């Protein structure tokens, strides 16, 4: 029996009937194979197993359930590109193809367990294949977005000492221009229907690769992936995660925040270069046996997004607050989201007004979560619990979330301080292992018995967390501490404001004052700027404590953002203070 898989614009992959189990031969060495066991490990009710491999102990188990009829007929991966091309892979097909890909990485590419592989691919099925193939072979997966510049790629390859890079045609010229400066780089693997001098062809090698592959028996604490932090306050750090921190650590997230079952179809819009893609498009979703839905949108388009949401049976949606801000400006009541039942957001704070507008137009709640590359989801609004607009929700298991002062003392409810995680005698397995080659930065994340997030917040009497800002985003004016998010939330309530960013600006009397950079809605772009400035300032004074109003206002066409859509307040702040 053969299965035909249609892959991107007239490309096809033929594979034989999915092979049987090709992993841990000794059953006594298997990690726990039930979701209940993984969840119990997260709750600290069971010890972490000595060995664990996500491909063998999760994906291959869903493949067996699929084969025996214990899982619904949903695909494991459902990919579309809006041009009529579509890929649907079952867990069995994903298993067969990823074994072939594993053989490509270890044989023609010559990679060995522990080698680091930089992967710079857009949202295409091969990104998932390479990811799983790295799991099967014990290679360290290092994703990056295709928006990385030549300088970015050079930094990542040199800092990581990557042995191989897997990239698309868009990135190949930039890689070629700096490859000679990367002495550790031995192999360049191209994902493209075309050949490229100096590169191996992934498609050609995959066609001829064997499906027979024995999965490496990786240790639970063995390196699995390296994620480069967004670098809003300096050069990106390399946060290394273990097999278990990613592969087991998101079991409870999938149940309680994402609310997934094996019948669900999850559309997570995160770019492939960031850990949010790992959370929502790999680990949490596949731990639950759900379907990962992917749309290859080169750029976000509101019409395309809404058409996709109405045309496909998507049940669960996760996107950045920026997307929801754009969507609520549409008449959403015109659209019928047939199966959509659960909506999530994260990456930056969600303005309460957007949450309320989304619910008013769709009838659906919006569940915000807060986390970091280093430690995953820290707190979240969960189904069945009260949502307090503007709050990021309560701390999630296994974390003990606290607000502390600069000395590591726990602050009472309602007092602003640093968001921190209280630690026990052992470092939680779901933490990142380290910042690679940077022990000082790794050590700096711990203060007494707390992990320091670098963010400031407030916790109320019910344990709900309220975001104030990055520690270095907080504005101190005439002795008052002002968080940018509250001012931005007040501004967005005004119909003239599409988006805003609030930073400190030097002032000879107050030391620093609040300055707002504002993107105007189309109907207000021709307004008298002086009058509109005064109107917006009065609006903020009436919406929050008057001392927080922006004494300076600048109207801009767009705000500087990271590749993930986070506002780069540090760029605006440096511009104000003459450090740009």
UniProtKB/Swiss-Prot annotation:
It is found in: Mitochondrion. Transmembrane segments: none annotated. ATP binds at residues 229-237, 368-373, 455, 470, 566. Keywords: ATP-binding, Fatty acid metabolism, Ligase, Lipid metabolism, Magnesium, Metal-binding, Mitochondrion, Nucleotide-binding, Transit peptide. One of its GO terms (cellular component) is mitochondrial matrix. Residues 1-22 form a transit peptide. One of its GO terms (molecular function) is odorant binding. One of its GO terms (biological process) is acyl-CoA metabolic process. PANTHER family: ACYL-COENZYME A SYNTHETASE (PTHR43605), ACYL-COENZYME A SYNTHETASE ACSM4, MITOCHONDRIAL (PTHR43605:SF8). Belongs to the ATP-dependent AMP-binding enzyme family. Catalyzes the activation of fatty acids by CoA to produce an acyl-CoA, the first step in fatty acid metabolism. Capable of activating medium-chain fatty acids with a preference for C6-12 fatty acids. This is Acyl-coenzyme A synthetase ACSM4, mitochondrial.
């Amino acid at each position: 029996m053969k299965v035909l898989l249609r892959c991107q614009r007239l490309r096809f992959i033929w594979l034989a009937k999915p092979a049987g189990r090709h992993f841990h031969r000794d059953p006594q060495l298997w990690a726990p194979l039930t979701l209940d066991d993984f969840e119990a490990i997260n709750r600290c009710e069971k010890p972490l197993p000595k060995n664990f491999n996500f491909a063998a102990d999760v994906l291959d188990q869903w493949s067996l359930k699929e084969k025996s009829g214990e899982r619904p007929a949903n695909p494991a991966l459902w990919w579309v590109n809006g041009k009529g091309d579509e890929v649907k892979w079952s867990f069995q097909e994903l298993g067969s193809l990823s074994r072939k890909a594993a053989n490509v990485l270890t044989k023609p590419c010559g990679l060995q367990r522990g080698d680091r592989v930089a992967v710079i691919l857009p949202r295409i099925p091969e990104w998932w294949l390479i990811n799983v193939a790295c799991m099967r072979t014990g290679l360290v997966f290092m994703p990056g977005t295709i928006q990385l510049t030549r300088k970015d790629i050079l930094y990542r390859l040199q800092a990581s000492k990557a042995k191989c890079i897997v990239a698309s045609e868009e990135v190949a010229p930039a890689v070629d221009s700096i490859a000679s400066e990367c002495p550790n780089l031995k192999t360049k693997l191209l994902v493209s229907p075309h050949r490229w001098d100096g590169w191996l062809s992934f498609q050609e090698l995959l066609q001829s690769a064997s499906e027979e592959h024995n999965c490496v028996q990786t240790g639970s604490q063995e390196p699995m992936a390296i994620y480069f932090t967004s670098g809003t306050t300096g050069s990106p750090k390399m946060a290394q995660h273990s097999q278990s921190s990613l592969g087991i650590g998101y079991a409870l997230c999938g149940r309680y925040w994402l609310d997934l079952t094996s019948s669900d179809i999850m559309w997570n819009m995160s770019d492939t270069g960031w850990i949010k893609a790992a959370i929502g498009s790999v680990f949490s979703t596949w731990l639950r046996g759900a379907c990962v839905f992917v749309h290859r949108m080169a750029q976000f388009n509101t019409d395309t997004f809404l058409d996709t949401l109405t045309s496909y049976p998507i049940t669960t949606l996760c996107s950045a607050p920026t997307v929801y801000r754009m969507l609520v400006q549409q008449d959403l009541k015109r659209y019928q989201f047939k199966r959509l039942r659960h909506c999530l957001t994260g990456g930056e704070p969600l303005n309460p007004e957007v949450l309320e507008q989304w619910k008013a137009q769709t009838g659906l709640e919006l569940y915000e979560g807060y986390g970091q590359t280093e430690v995953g989801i820290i707190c979240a609004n969960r189904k069945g619990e009260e949502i307090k607009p503007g709050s990021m929700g309560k701390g999630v298991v296994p974390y003990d979330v606290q607000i502390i002062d600069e000395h590591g003392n726990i602050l009472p409810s309602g007092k602003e301080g640093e968001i921190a995680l209280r630690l026990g005698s052992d470092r939680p397995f779901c933490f990142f292992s380290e910042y690679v080659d940077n022990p000082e930065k790794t050590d700096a994340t711990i203060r007494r018995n707390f992990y320091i997030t670098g963010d400031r917040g407030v916790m109320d009497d019910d344990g709900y967390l309220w975001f104030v800002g990055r520690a270095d985003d907080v504005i101190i004016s005439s002795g008052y501490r002002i968080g940018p998010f509250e001012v931005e939330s007040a501004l967005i309530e005004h119909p003239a404001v599409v988006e805003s960013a609030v930073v400190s600006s030097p002032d000879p009397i107050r030391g620093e004052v609040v300055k707002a950079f504002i993107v105007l809605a189309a109907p207000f772009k021709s307004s008298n700027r002086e009058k509109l400035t005064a109107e917006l300032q009065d609006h903020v004074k009436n919406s929050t404590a008057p001392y927080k109003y922006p004494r300076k206002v600048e109207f801009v066409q767009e705000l500087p953002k990271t590749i993930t859509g986070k506002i780069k307040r540090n760029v605006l702040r440096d511009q104000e203070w003459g450090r740009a």
